[in-house]
Amino acid sequence: MSNVDHSYTHCRGLPARVISDNPTRVYRAKPNEKCKKGYYKVMMFVCPGRPTNYIRQGDFHFYVQHGVVEYRIKPGDTQASVAKFFKIPESRIKRAGKFVVGKCIVFRANVFSHKRGWATGPLLVDASGKSIKDPRKANRNYPGLNYSRYCSSFCVKNRGIKVGKSHSNII
């Protein structure tokens, strides 16, 4: 998204700017609408700027939906605890393969992830440490940044999206 003369304290104009950056690869969708084949769901929120916020001019934040999760088993995990965390049947975890610490298992979970800034990896948990089934219902109140306003949902093509410095509209 071009960042010239824009505020992130409200949603006004942001969804249109997202689409204008990749007009053939992004379209608006309703939050519960299934995306076309080859697309995935993204939800956008803003943190209104306030003098007490870490970023006074506001900030925007995206959550990305994943139908399938690749999960590395940690010490202390059980099939039941992983199923409970992702809010899925335990049988789905059992079908994912041998349950051994350090092993990656792949299963359907239909959860969202997000990134807190450029320097972090994707997170599957909200501000309370819970899995994110619907970002609108998740805890988005992080220290200094409360992404309290839902803006829009989009469906994004799986490949070919331009972001950051790779896009000519981005400064």
Predicted regions and their residues:
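Residues in the helix-turn-helix
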Residues: 92
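Generic structural motif
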Residues: 48, 76, 158-159
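...with weaker cross-activation on analogous glycine-rich loops/strands in unrelated enzymes
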Residues: 7-70, 104-119
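Residues in the recognition helix of alpha-helical DNA-binding motifs
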Residues: 96
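N-terminal trafficking/processing presequences and adjacent post-cleavage segments
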Residues: 1-6
